[in-house]
Regions:
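Conserved hydrophobic positions within beta-strands
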Residues: 29-31
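Loop/turn positions that initiate beta-strands
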Residues: 18-19
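Short, solvent-exposed secondary-structure boundary/capping segments
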Residues: 37-48
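Short, Lys/Arg-enriched N-terminal segments with co-localized hydrophobic residues
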Residues: 1-13
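Charge/polar-rich, low-complexity and marginally structured segments
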Residues: 66-183
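A short macromolecule-binding patch
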Residues: 53-64
Length: 183
């Protein structure tokens, strides 16, 4: 029990009220509160997250659940985003031919991956999509859904940090890559 208390104290230091975090597939969230709630016969502490781009939504993350808390990541800085964009042209991961293995691996990246892995995932699926388009085919619906989810997570964070609209993220990225290529 004492170890749990230590963990709670340690985790509580990690995030405080009004911190902005990236939380799994919910995207950019503000830590609205750290509260206690009765759950069965015990009181538990929760981070209360408000997704920035999902009006009216609330997410409760138990402070003691280190797996869920691990999905709460500090948002990137402007400098981090520029570095990710600069490295973007070289970022891909291996295309996995087995549909089930690919789905599992790519969903794992969505759940727990770094931003670099998200960029690699987006670029890999995009390149496969373009390759198939040339021969009159399309990617599987599952791959398309994973692609859209990865874009949503990454582009919402970029938009929030850069203080631009989500629709402006892709043009911003292309512009930054263009500038880098010219220099």
């Amino acid at each position: 029990m004492q170890a749990t208390f230590f963990l709670e104290k340690e985790v509580r230091k990690m995030f405080k009220k009004n911190d902005t975090v990236l939380y799994s597939s919910e995207g950019v969230c503000v830590v609205n509160d750290i509260t206690q709630r009765q759950f069965k016969d015990r009181i538990m502490q929760y981070y209360v997250l408000k997704p920035v781009y999902k009006e009216g939504a609330t997410v409760f993350v138990p402070v003691e659940n280190k797996d869920l808390v691990a999905k709460m990541k500090r948002i990137l800085s402007v400098e981090d985003i520029h570095q990710l964009i600069e490295d973007m042209p070289n970022q891909t991961i291996e295309w996995i031919d087995n549909d089930n293995l690919r789905k599992d691996k790519y969903r794992e990246i969505l759940r727990n991956g770094s931003r670099k892995q998200l960029i690699q995932l987006i670029r890999t699926i995009y390149l496969k999509q373009e390759e198939l388009k040339k021969i009159g085919k399309k990617i599987h619906a599952t791959d398309d859904n994973i692609f859209k989810e990865a874009e949503k997570i990454l582009y919402e964070e970029f938009a929030y940090v850069l203080n631009i609209h989500k629709e402006e993220v892709v043009p911003f990225i292309f512009h930054q890559i263009e500038l880098k290529e010219k220099s």
